[in-house]
Amino acid sequence: MRNTERPEAASEPDLKKRTKAVALRILKLVDAMPKTTAGRALASRIVRSGTSVAANYRAACRAKSTADFIAKMGIVEEEADQTLFWLELPEESELVTAGKLPAIKQEANELIAITVASIKTARRNRSSHSALRIPNSALE
């Protein structure tokens, strides 16, 4: 993140690549899912939430303020968690073979952990910066 008012989390280019890679893997996964009613319904949900993680992370990287960054990263966290949920269902309902999903589910878990850590860091940095302000100062 180039704006010095926003927190520096994990490497921005790396996370952009990772979130986009997950989106691409999801697109390939859903093409391999059965064309049943359940398969199509789950595929649609997985595509929406899984690609949304990458799109919303890109938006967070362009946040105008720390508050905006935190809000956008909250959306990334929610979408990543929903993606994980939707990825669990095809495996548990035996729509896909058990070995197809562990790697992508692991990556989703890692992205959630990174996102949560980034949000916590941003909140902590915001709090420490506001503590440095002098109350009722003419400089504020």
PLM features: what roles do these ranges have?
Residues M1-E140:
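Amphipathic alpha-helical assembly/interaction segments
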